From Swiss-Prot:
Record note on disruption phenotype: Larvae infected with Gram-negative bacteria fail to activate tracheal expression of the antibacterial peptide gene Drs. Ectopic bristles develop on the dorsocentral, scutellar and lateral regions of the noctum, with one or more ectopic bristles per hemi-notum.
Feature type site, description Cleavage (when cotranslationally processed): D545, G546
Composition skew (Basic and acidic residues), residue ranges: 866-877
Residue windows of the ANK repeats: 640-669, 673-702, 710-740, 745-775, 783-812
Protein name: Nuclear factor NF-kappa-B p110 subunit
Assembly information from the UniProt record: Rel-p68 subunit interacts with Dredd. Interacts with DMAP1. Interacts with akirin; interaction is immune stimulation-dependent; activates selected rel target gene promoters.
Length: 971
């Protein structure tokens, strides 16, 4: 017979109970609780037994589970918590130093693992005071003491997306699981802190499922001694070490499907053994564990995990006692999964399409699921609001191996637009509404018939009234006939007739509006006397021209003819001879194009003639300029959409470009392929045409950011063709063109130079320095790669090293200096590879004008900048003297020796003299990449023309008088 204490669930206190059975189920199996032979606790009343049985069978999640059990807020549950009868600490099972468990472990309290044992709270006297750790003796803290209870708090969440790798992919080095706020520098990692506790503890990190408080089949590994150690991972914290645990260098190994059950079962079994403080489980427990694992393995999300953090105290006997409820991180999604990975469009087959839609478009994308992906086209206004959207059409079979989508573009909302419309393309995953970033630009081009109609309309307004022999239908912008005019004496009054003779105005208000117009008033003012003699206005009835219109009498026909002749005479007298000639030239110009098979104008033909008829072409340009027909020239394009400038660039006839620009031809007009004349010149490698554009003074400024239908600017085309001289001229004209990304794959000029593996172009681009250099270096293309990352993928050590030398570190500005050895090698290699018939590539010196310590401006001019200060004796010397002195080996070596010595005074006596010299000569921007005085003097030697001798000498005198004397008096 046993004497046991049981907790009275109804009265909220412990009572003594005599039991002659050894059952641990809470009551004797041999005696009914209703028997009158014994004194039973009220805890064994039928109602209580029913509730107790229901409670024991409940599958309650841990305290930190995002899914609260249905009974969490029930009156019965609240009564248990208020009375202190149940120690609900989430997934914890408190174990005292003697190995006796206390607290209640429900079915899910051990990571959602089933347990067939019920643990009751011992009597208060049995709980040693030293085991409380901020809790009351019943294991619960009162409301007033919550702030003193040990608890874990996540300081840094893990990244939202991380690549899960298979074990076969774990060779070599890979990125670790970083924190959500991690940057290139500084990096952060998942971090958790233990609060309200001042003793030694262990913080454990393990991998859990997102929808259950249960381990995940994937492995959370840390590389140690060339091997991967699987979770859980433990970190010791204490008052001396601090209570912040940072888990670094962790990776996630994706478990193959055929091993999911095995790995999950092993993890759950190990965790249950640890929590029960046993060596092995019973056969029944193993069987139930297998069944539970089978259920979880079927529905487990293999592309989403989370971290579980737990805190323990290790007792003297080796028992691990939980200190606080576990906490769980945000979900970590598999970056390479089609279901949860990051969506990204890497490249478009073409960035343009027609407004009618149904154009085939191929998208190269990151991994997507064919059953869970959409391609969205959308347009935004100036405020970023979506004003139009549509989805591309494609079948599941059009998604090729999860990395390419062949789709048909949707039609644009307005099929009659007469200009290009810029929209965007993005991917959408309907399951979680994830969208690709960045959205790539796409251009809708108008229909050719609309463009042709627009071009004809531009010239037709003048053409309609161009000739004196034209019909009076278009004269003076008046109606075909004016029915209310009174003819000369002798003619009948027109108002006596019921029908009007007007064919253009059907309502009285239209006529009134016309009469009240400014043009009509001017007509009356300019020729009012003649009008009074010829016609008298009569406000007769103006009726609608119907089908039953009365026949016009013969005398009325004479009236119409008389008025037509009248207005024709007025028109001839009103138009000056030069205007008549203007209209005739314009008419011939347009008619010739319309009657031509390729719709070439006279200007197109004389420029593109096989034999360059310079005199004839120049005369034609002069005539067009004389009559100010620039609008006609810009609007009348041939069948290919080429202007006269396009044709001149195609035929490599640069001598026509400046006259055409002077006449007002637009150099930014695009042809049907989206190419401007400058695109054509670069594509055809006609350097003289490029120079004519860049050196001319066009009335319309050249726009080097315009892209063609392939998404390329002229600079992109020059880099792709590896044309150093063309790229150099374009960059000299507009440095901002370097940062323009092509619309096909998002690569800027630096990206493309890396892909071409051209060190010469890289140095050219990096030398064209401005305040945006750091942005260019850190810019990502559509695939999310920076130029340095692309270079590392190409594995060209020379290119990688060059970019690393200028790449910004730790928030510093990008280095504004290209190693001299690299430039010398480029010069020598360019000289050797240059052919006799090609332009020689030379590396010009780039001069630096230092305005202050934070801004450095470079001059791309070919000649060095020389500055003299007549007020100082030293500045009267040629600045090149500094270069000559430093080329003297004795002086150079001696200065290096002196400047590499410690300063010996000031706030930092150990600071080297050359560093102080760099600050005083405004070269502080470069000091962080210099290792010693040799680097400083090498820079001054190269850039001596931009470093004043007097400034350098005065700074050197303040830093080291001995070095100053050596420089001023080298003899």
């Amino acid at each position: 017979m046993n004497m046991n204490q049981y907790y009275d669930l109804d009265n909220g206190k412990n009572v003594m109970f005599m039991n002659d059975a050894s059952s641990t189920s809470g009551y004797s199996s041999s005696t009914s609780p209703n028997s009158t032979n014994r004194s039973f606790s009220p805890a064994h009343s039928p109602k209580t037994m029913e509730l107790q049985t229901d409670f024991a069978n409940l599958n309650l999640p841990g305290g930190n589970s995002p899914h609260q059990p249905p009974m969490a807020n029930s009156p019965y549950q609240n009564q248990l918590l208020n009375n202190g009868g149940i120690c609900q600490l989430g997934a914890t099972n408190l174990i005292n130093s003697t190995g006796v468990s206390f607290g209640v472990a429900n079915v899910t309290s051990f990571g959602n693992m089933y347990m067939d044992h019920q643990y009751f709270v011992p009597a208060p006297a049995t709980v040693p005071p030293s085991q409380n750790f901020g809790y009351h003796q019943n294991g619960l803290a009162s409301d007033g003491d919550i702030k003193h209870v040990p608890q874990l708090r996540i300081v840094e969440q893990p990244v939202e997306k991380f690549r899960f790798r298979y074990k076969s992919e774990m060779h070599g080095t890979h990125g670790s699981l970083n924190g959500a706020n991690s940057k290139r520098t500084p990096k952060t990692f998942p971090e958790v802190t233990l609060c309200n506790y001042d003793g030694p503890a262990v913080i454990r990190c393990s991998l859990f499922q997102t929808n259950l408080d249960s381990p995940h089949s994937h492995q959370l590994v840390v590389r140690k001694d060339d091997r991967d150690v699987c979770d859980p991972h433990d970190l010791h914290v204490s008052k001396e070490r601090g209570y912040v645990a940072q888990f670094i260098n962790m990776g996630i190994i994706h478990t193959a499907k055929k091993y999911i059950f095995e790995e999950l079962c092993k993890k759950k079994q190990d965790r249950l053994v640890f929590q029960m403080n046993r060596r092995e489980l019973s056969h029944k427990q193993l069987q139930e564990l297998h069944q539970e694992t089978e259920r979880e393995a079927k529905d487990m999300n293999l592309n989403q995990v989370r971290l579980c953090f737990e805190a323990f105290k290790i007792e003297d006997n080796g028992a691990w006692v939980p200190l606080a409820p576990p906490v769980y991180s945000n979900a970590i999604n598999n970056r390479k999964s089609a279901q949860t990975g990051e969506l990204r469009i890497v490249r478009l087959s073409k960035p343009t399409g027609g407004v009618m839609g149904n154009d085939e478009l191929i998208l190269l994308v990151e991994k997507v699921s064919k059953k869970n992906i959409k391609v969205r086209f959308f347009e935004e206004d100036e405020d970023g609001e979506t004003v139009w959207e549509a989805y591309a059409k494609f079948r599941e079979s059009d998604v090729h191996h999860q990395y390419a989508i062949v789709c048909q573009t949707p039609p644009y909302k307005d099929k009659d637009v007469d200009r290009e419309v810029n929209v965007y393309i993005e991917l959408i995953r309907p399951s979680d509404d994830e969208r690709s970033f960045p959205a790539l630009p796409f251009r809708y081009k108008p229909r050719s018939v609309i463009v042709s109609r627009k071009r004809r309309r531009t010239g037709s307004s003048a053409n309609s009234s161009s000739s004196g022999t034209e019909s009076s239908n278009n004269s003076l912008d008046l109606p075909k006939t004016l029915g209310l005019a009174q003819p000369p004496n002798g003619l009948p009054n027109l108002s006596q007739h019921d029908q009007t003779i007007s064919e253009e105005f059907g309502r009285e208000k239209h006529l009134n509006e016309f009469i009240a117009s400014e043009d009509f008033r001017k007509l009356i003012e300019h020729n009012s006397s003649d009008l009074e003699k010829i016609c008298q206005l009569d406000m007769g009835e103006l009726q609608h021209d119907g089908h039953n219109r009365a026949e016009v009498p013969s005398h009325r026909n004479r009236t119409i003819k008389c008025l037509d002749d009248l207005f024709e005479i007025y028109k001839q007298d009103r138009i000056s001879p030069i205007k008549i000639s203007h209209h005739k030239v314009e008419k011939w110009f347009i008619e010739h194009a319309l009657n031509n098979y390729n719709r070439d104008t006279l200007l197109h033909e004389v420029i593109s003639h096989k034999k360059d008829k310079l005199k004839l072409a120049i005369q034609t340009i002069q005539v067009m300029n004389y009559f100010n027909l620039k609008d006609v020239v810009n609007s009348t394009l041939n069948a290919d959409g080429d202007s006269a400038l396009h044709v001149a660039c195609q035929q490599d006839r640069a001598h026509y470009i400046r006259p055409l620009l002077g006449m007002g031809c637009n150099p930014n007009l695009k042809n049907n392929a989206g190419n401007t004349p400058l695109h054509v010149a670069v594509k055809e490698e006609h350097l003289s045409c490029v120079e004519s554009f860049l050196n001319g003074v066009p009335t319309v400024q050249l726009d080097l950011s315009l892209t063609n239908d392939d998404g390329l600017t002229p600079l992109h085309m020059a880099i792709r063709q590896n044309k150093y001289d063309v790229a150099k001229k374009l960059i000299s004209y507009d440095r901002t063109s370097i940062s323009v990304a092509n619309t096909m794959d998002g690569n800027n000029a630096l990206h493309m130079a890396v892909l071409e593996q051209s060190v010469e172009l890289l140095v050219l681009i990096l030398d064209a320095q401005n305040e945006n250099l750091t942005d260019i270096l850190q810019a990502q293309n559509a695939a999310g790669h920076t130029p340095l990352e692309l270079a590392e993928r190409k594995a060209n050590d020379r290119v990688v090293q060059l970019l690393k030398n200028v790449y910004p570190e730790k928030g510093e500005l990008a280095m504004t200096w290209i190693p001299c050895k690299v430039k010398e090698e480029i010069d020598s290699s360019s000289d050797e590879s240059s052919d006799a018939g090609q332009l020689e590539i030379k590396s010009e010196e780039m001069d630096i004008e230092t305005k202050d310590e934070d801004s450095v401006e470079l001059d791309l001019s070919s000649g060095p900048r020389r500055q003299k200060d007549e007020s100082s004796r030293d500045t009267e010397m040629d600045n090149n003297k500094l270069q000559l002195l430093l080329k003297n080996k004795f002086i150079y070596d001696r200065l290096c020796s002196l400047l590499n010595q410690p300063l010996g005074h000031g706030s930092d006596p150990q600071d080297r003299k050359w560093m102080q010299l760099a600050r005083q000569t405004h070269l502080k921007q470069f000091a962080f990449i210099w290792l010693g005085a040799e680097d400083l003097l090498d820079h001054v030697k190269r850039k001596g023309a931009s470093v004043e001798f007097s400034t350098f000498a005065r700074a050197l005198q303040a830093v080291d008088p001995q070095a100053y004397a050596l420089l001023v008096n080298p003899t």
